[in-house]
Amino acid sequence: MATINELQDEVVEEFQDFTDWMDKYQMLIDLGNELAPLDEKYKNEQNLIDGCQSRVWLQCDYVDGKLVFTADSDALVVKGIIALLIRVLSGHTPTEIMDADLYFVEKIGLKDHLSPTRSNGLLAMIKQIRMYALAYKTKEAEA
């Protein structure tokens, strides 16, 4: 499996093909549409991310020492953003996720082109992913 940085570099390369931000938004929507559906049983208050204007559910499973994320949102652009985060971070260890510098967010211009509420939502999604990583890293240390 590719490293987090290799996956980030792939994302940056794909987004460099577009100079117009409308095309980048369309790519986010397409990525959201391609995101595997989240089982309805996971669309609950426990998996709802606080701090997002849209509703975003994030499910985390611990499989063979790695975190596997699935998610959904009721907003297409937000669904695309969480799809990017899942693509880069899912399948990695809690330590790798905790130590990751998510530079792709800035390199593709995401921070600069999101509304303040969507930027806050992006930060909330990253924070929730890192919280899962911290929780599982703590469980590993206790085992």
Name each model feature, range by range:
Residues 4-55, 62-66, 105-142:
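N-terminal intrinsically disordered, cationic/polar leader segments
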Residues 82-92:
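Alpha-helical support elements that line or immediately flank enzyme active sites
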Residues 73-75:
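A short interface-forming secondary-structure element
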Residues 91-108:
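Glycine-rich phosphate/pyrophosphate-binding loops
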